[in-house]
């Protein structure tokens, strides 16, 4: 086996025909500026080729389902192992996915609870014991003399198949009837079941009317049914068609409740035998939220206080006005009064209806006038009924804007049915155990006391649970609970969970490619992550990590610096070798920052703010412990703390959502807090995240920043366009008129290849230019609209230097370090860091009010230290204009440049949620209890 991976002639995206050697069984870090070509080399070339070769080895039938990977633009790659990509874009959005299910810990927990769990009665909580035939007979006879009963044996419960043999055996044994999926069949007829569906089948053993003289017959029938089904007896009570399940295995003597034998599926919320029947295992239900129906209580009903569809036009001539006028007359209130001044009785009637009491509705329509007497359903029952009845996705989506998720009333958000939640191990239900953090869950397993027999059964299961929980702790995720929904995890957390799962698999000879695993990780936990990566390497695997973290780069066996610039200025190998060799290379920008020759300077002075504060009182969302914090306005404030300490709960869930609801009229549900003071000093809140600026290839930096509107207006004002009668719309590639109709303005055509990947070829009519011939004949300074879209920001800045409006927007794009991107570049090809800087540039180009608060969550994700320097300059400019910038960040280069810090902790999860310290970076660095302060101290020397 070769000792290296050889990449020859890589040209994917902006890579300039580069050759790279990567040592096998080593930790290699690829670094470089944002947009320099790191991901193009690691993911789009090496990983894509590894995947393609694997998929190509499968049959054409299998390839049809997997989707064929396109061959990357590379001459050849030698020494390639099977490749596994662990990136940040694959976080599951499935509401059924949790930390426990993703890591497979939950599978072992289900097995443990099924094998050594102690069942209890879901009614009285008493421990359930096995039920005898005599007890079953006593309960059936208690139904009363004359009751008609069918005794059935449940032979198949929730299993796929046609089950032909079951019917044949029953027929051969002399039985006459069976019930399949609730339908009764005669065994003499042909019974056909769908092979791929799950079925329930019961054999009818006896049909009888309960009387004292049938006890012996009933006993024989129950014993026969139990023998057929392995201990289960189903009594079908007629004529109600009500089923009672009895079990020789487990039953409560006092309540007479039976439960089936404990199986792993009883503890799965993704299986109908375990899931709560009310919420089907989701743990939540969508309910109409009064706070979202009437978000602003200072507005009157007449002025549109109600935001719900169908009830938001009280001034109109519709039915809503009729109802509200009748309500105001009957309950003596004015439609002009602010909602907050209406009594609780009036609000209850408006929201929940008149409970059958009729109103006098007066109508005056073109077709006539008159009086109707009708009850008022109430806004909330009306919205809930319409939501259940509608078949329209559009209506459903509109109604969901007034709804919020709340815990299921039946299971209390625990996802499982009552019988499953009543089974305990060590005194805890499986749901209670999953509410524990990883570190507490490990302690519980270590201290668990089992009988000798239970220990023999559960020993191997407990070992697997401990191993998997240990892997989660080793990647710095000890604060997560196993019940945490996967959709709520950050990109870094999701990636580290997948990393922990891979360590658990103990594979050898695999090529792992990771994308910034240090994201969201405090400096304190970095050593744990590095130890995990080295452990994966020492198993005999090759690791390629795209990373900007200096500690990770120093710990690498081999370092590759891609650059020297970004976009068209990048795509070359600037330096490679050991970290020491890269540091010694004068051409490497990364090496200069690693060696300390270049660094981000600490500001000479810290801003004090404008004298006003935004204060959060009594924050209690997630793990926040009644927290009070104040943020000085007019400053650059950083919220720090270890992973899981409560930063996102405070900033994203409480501050952003509360300000968004009050200042921006957003329909959101803010996190729990007693009050937020100081809102009057702000006019709007803007969250600048790394989400894409558009999800279709038609979206680009020019359209997002509104540059394209100005460019189209400019082309429409040319003499040529005026002579032809072209307006600005003619120069849009999204509408008919100016665009090329052969490709609908896409510039390319998709050709489906079935067993091969779809091919995109340039449109033959417009040659990829998106516009028709007539539109392209209109020129400004010798360039067509298509030529302008192909320009980089730097080229456009020079081209439009005489036009102040265009020049200002282009200059801000250049100042945030995006001079290399093309104006018409598809937004889907931009990295998260690039998308975030496009948003920042858009905000910078707007006229500042000086009263805006900007919120950024880990803005340095995907950014090289040199990019971070540019980002900080932009953020400082926003603050210099009088605005407030609030940032969640772990990168010390950003933290040291802040005016004010809020350090949460001290630990993650239940050990966090308090304010450890606050103040300037120097004051936080002086705090011995602050983990952030300990690392910050070295940076401020």
Where are these regions (language model features)?
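Conserved phosphate-binding elements of NTP-dependent enzyme cores
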Residues: 1-941
């Amino acid at each position: 086996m070769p000792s290296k991976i050889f990449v020859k002639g890589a040209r994917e995206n902006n890579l300039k025909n580069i050759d790279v050697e990567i040592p096998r069984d080593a930790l290699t870090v690829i670094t470089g500026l944002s947009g320099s070509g790191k991901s193009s080399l690691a993911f789009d070339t090496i990983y894509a080729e590894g995947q393609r070769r694997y998929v190509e080895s499968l049959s054409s039938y299998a390839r049809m389902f997997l989707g064929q990977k396109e061959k990357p633009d590379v001459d050849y790659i030698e020494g390639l192992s099977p490749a596994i990509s662990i990136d940040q874009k694959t976080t599951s959005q499935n509401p059924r996915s949790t930390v426990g299910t993703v890591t497979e810990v939950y599978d072992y927990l289900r097995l443990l609870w099924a094998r050594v769990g102690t069942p209890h009665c879901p009614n009285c909580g008493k421990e359930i014991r096995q039920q005898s035939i005599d007890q079953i007979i006593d309960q059936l006879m208690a139904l009363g003399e004359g009751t008609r009963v069918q005794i059935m044996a449940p032979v198949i419960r929730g299993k796929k198949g046609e089950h032909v043999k079951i019917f044949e055996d029953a027929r051969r044994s002399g039985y006459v009837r069976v019930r399949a999926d609730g339908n009764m069949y005669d065994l003499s007829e042909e019974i056909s079941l769908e092979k791929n569906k799950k079925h329930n089948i019961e054999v009818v053993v006896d049909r009888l009317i309960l009387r004292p003289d049938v006890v012996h017959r009933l006993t024989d029938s129950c014993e026969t049914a139990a023998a057929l089904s392995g201990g289960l007896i189903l009594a079908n009570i007629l004529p109600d068609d009500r089923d009672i399940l009895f079990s020789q295995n487990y039953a409560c003597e006092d309540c007479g409740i039976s439960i089936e034998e404990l199986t792993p599926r009883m503890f799965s919320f993704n299986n109908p035998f375990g899931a709560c029947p009310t919420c089907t295992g989701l743990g939540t239900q969508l309910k109409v939220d009064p706070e979202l129906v009437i978000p602003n209580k200072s507005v009157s009903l007449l002025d549109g206080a109600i935001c719900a569809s169908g009830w938001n036009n009280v001034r109109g001539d519709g039915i809503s006005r009729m109802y509200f006028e009748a309500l105001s007359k009957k309950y003596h209130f004015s439609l002009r009064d602010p909602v907050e001044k209406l009594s609780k009785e009036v609000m209850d009637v408006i929201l929940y209806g008149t409970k059958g009491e009729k109103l006098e509705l007066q109508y005056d329509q073109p077709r006539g006038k008159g009086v109707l007497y009708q009850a008022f359903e109430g806004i909330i029952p009306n919205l809930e009924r319409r939501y259940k009845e509608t078949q329209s996705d559009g209506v459903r989506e509109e109604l969901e804007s007034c709804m919020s998720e709340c815990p299921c009333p039946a299971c209390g958000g625990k996802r499982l049915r009552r019988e499953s939640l009543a089974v305990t191990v060590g005194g805890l239900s499986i749901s209670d155990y999953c509410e524990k953090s990883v570190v507490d869950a490990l302690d519980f397993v270590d201290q668990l006391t089992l009988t000798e027999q239970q220990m023999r059964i559960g020993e191997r299961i407990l070992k697997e649970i401990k191993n998997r929980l240990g892997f989660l702790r080793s990647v710095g995720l000890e604060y997560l609970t196993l019940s945490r929904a996967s959709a709520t995890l950050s990109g870094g957390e999701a990636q580290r969970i997948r990393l922990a799962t891979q360590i658990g698999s103990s594979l050898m000879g695999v090529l792992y490619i990771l994308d910034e695993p240090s994201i969201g990780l405090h400096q304190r936990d970095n050593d744990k992550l590095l130890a995990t990566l080295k452990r994966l390497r020492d198993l005999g695997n090759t690791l390629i990590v795209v990373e900007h973290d200096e500690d990770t780069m120093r710990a690498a066996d081999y370092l590759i610096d891609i650059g020297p610039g970004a976009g068209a200025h990048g795509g070359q190998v600037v330096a490679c070798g050991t970290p020491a060799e890269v540091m010694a290379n004068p051409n490497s920008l990364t090496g200069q920052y690693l060696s300390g020759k270049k660094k981000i300077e600490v500001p000479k002075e810290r801003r004090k703010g404008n004298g006003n504060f935004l204060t959060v009182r009594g924050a209690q969302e997630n793990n926040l412990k009644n927290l009070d914090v104040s943020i000085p306005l007019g400053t650059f404030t950083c919220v720090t703390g270890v992973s899981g300490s409560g930063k996102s709960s405070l900033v994203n869930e409480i501050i952003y959502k509360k300000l968004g609801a009050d200042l921006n009229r957003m329909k959101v549900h803010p996190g729990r807090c007693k009050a937020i003071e100081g809102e009057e000093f702000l006019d709007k809140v803007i969250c600048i995240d790394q989400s894409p600026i558009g999800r279709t290839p038609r979206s680009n930096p020019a359209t997002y920043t509104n540059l394209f509107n100005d460019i189209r207006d400019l082309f429409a004002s040319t003499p040529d366009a005026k002579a032809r009668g072209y307006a600005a719309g003619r120069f849009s590639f999204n509408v008919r008129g100016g665009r090329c109709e052969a490709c609908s303005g896409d510039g390319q055509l998709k050709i489906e290849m079935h067993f091969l990947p779809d091919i995109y070829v340039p449109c033959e009519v417009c040659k990829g230019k998106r516009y028709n011939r007539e539109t392209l004949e209109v020129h400004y300074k010798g360039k067509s609209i298509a030529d302008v879209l192909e320009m980089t920001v730097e080229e456009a800045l020079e081209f439009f230097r005489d036009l102040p409006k265009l020049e200002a927007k282009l200059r801000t794009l250049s100042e945030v370090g995006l001079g290399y991107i093309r104006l018409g570049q598809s937004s889907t090809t931009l990295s998260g860091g690039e998308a975030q800087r496009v948003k920042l540039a858009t905000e910078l180009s707007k006229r500042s009010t000086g009263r805006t608060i900007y919120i950024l969550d880990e803005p340095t994700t995907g950014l090289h230290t040199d990019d971070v320097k540019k980002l900080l300059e932009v953020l400082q400019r926003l603050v210099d204009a009088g605005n407030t910038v609030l940032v969640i960040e772990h990168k010390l280069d950003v933290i040291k440049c802040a005016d004010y810090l809020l350090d949460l902790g001290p630990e993650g999860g239940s050990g966090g949620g308090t304010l450890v310290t606050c103040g300037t970076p120097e004051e936080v660095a002086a705090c011995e209890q602050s983990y952030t302060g300990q690392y910050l101290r070295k940076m401020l020397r």
